[in-house]
Amino acid sequence: CAVRTLVSDITPLIDLQSKYDCEIQASAFLGTSPIRQYTEGWNMEKILSTAEKAVSFAIENDVPVMFVTEDTTRSKPEDIKEVYTRALELGVERICICDTCGHVTPNGVNKLLSFIQNEVIPDAGFKRRNIEVNWHGHQDRGLGVANNIAAFESGADVIHGTALGIGERAGNAPLDQTLVNLSLMGVISNDLTALDEYIKKAHEYIKIPLPRNYPIFGNDAFETGTGVHASAVVKAMDKGDHWLADRIYSGVPATDYGLKQVIRIGHMSGRSNIIWWLKNNGYEITDKLVEYMFNV
């Protein structure tokens, strides 16, 4: 449960844990960047004091804490180190590094996570394997998925995302695209064939647009009307080689995600598009009909 790093925000979690006899993690967030400090009139002494009071209160009352630094990617290294060190000393076992404003690039993700895992955690007296490192990215520069992949490659234990990148401003890193890319990289082996239905439900219930050209799950993602492209796909299908058909003109194999290649007829179509479309829609194929449709 996301909470501000305040005793008043953590108190209800204590009551809920008692009422329902289950642990509720407090994802306690606190801004650390110079721009936030200047805006709020904070200094590091204030930030550390706030963190100490809230984290100590949570741990003393058996509320598990993930300590979240907002705007980590625009924070000073020395400030990041100081606040995470204090949180770890207080008993925090999970931390979350945030690109709250969608500021960082993949190279920056790698450098930041390397700094935290190879310097901050061990210098605080802890073994990296005993601390869960989370990455939370945003999409302001369109780098959410690339940064998620960089975070994975840099050793983050947990990668955050949302369906269709739903979130404030330009949104969070898209969970769906992150999963597809990780599966294509061979680092996860989950069955993702239900992901399309999940995305369509998110689109339906949350009323967020799903552009036709949205990667993987947009209606046009595996559709072609171009003659040369369609001809190659048809040749692969005629060979009975669906593996080939899925890849000859697509960087993502549709069937791995419960989808399929679609051939349409358009202004750039060739005769192979027309023949394939007629065949798959139950029409008798004649030279006259094919020629007529081609010239319309």
Residue map of PLM features:
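Generic structural signal for well-ordered, non-membrane alpha-helical segments
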Residues: L6, I10, M44-A51, I80, ...
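Catalytic alpha/beta core domains of metabolic enzymes, predominantly
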Residues: V104-P106, K111-K239
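Conserved beta-strand edge residues that scaffold enzyme active sites
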Residues: T72-T73, C101, D140, G165-I166, ...
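A mid-to-C-terminal "edge-of-domain" accessory segment
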Residues: I188-V296
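Alpha/beta enzyme core
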Residues: V7-V133, I149-S154
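A glycine-rich helix N-cap at a beta->alpha junction
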Residues: C1-A2
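Residue-level marker of alpha-helix boundaries and capping positions
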Residues: E45, R74, H138-Q139, S189, ...
